[in-house]
């Protein structure tokens, strides 16, 4: 499978469109992060996540809460109606991951967030060609 994003498509593609590309699937788990693009996506404990089954159980909850207005502006920036990413240190490994807070700075919850931009980055750098 070959997926390629140029700058123009990146500004216009939302998560629904990315899901339709067939690159995402849901997986049970907790906090997700990218340890190393070459090694694929790993969870907060450093356990590899299947490259073809990236974690998106957060997608539905975020879609409901924010009326599916999820847009990728660049690899490290996602806008969800004023929601912001906050970076935290994973206590079990000392590695960093991100959590999603709404516009009132309220934590949305473990079941309702994920690092969408990291999954997007993984696609961009690992599935091209």
From Swiss-Prot:
Keywords: Cytoplasm, Nucleus. One of its GO terms (cellular component) is nucleus. It is found in: Cytoplasm, Cytosol; Nucleus. This is Uncharacterized protein C1348.15. It comes from Schizosaccharomyces pombe (strain 972 / ATCC 24843).
């Amino acid at each position: 499978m070959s997926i390629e994003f140029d700058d123009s498509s990146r500004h216009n593609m939302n998560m629904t469109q990315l899901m339709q590309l067939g690159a995402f699937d849901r997986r049970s788990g907790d906090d997700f992060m990218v340890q190393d693009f070459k090694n694929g996506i790993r969870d907060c404990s450093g356990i590899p996540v299947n490259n073809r089954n990236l974690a998106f159980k957060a997608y539905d909850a975020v879609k409901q809460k924010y009326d599916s207005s999820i847009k990728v502006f660049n690899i490290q920036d996602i806008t969800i109606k004023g929601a912001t990413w906050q970076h935290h240190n994973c206590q079990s490994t000392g590695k960093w991951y991100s959590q999603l807070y709404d516009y009132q700075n309220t934590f949305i919850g473990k079941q309702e967030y994920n690092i969408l931009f990291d999954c997007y980055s993984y696609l961009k750098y690992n599935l091209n060609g």
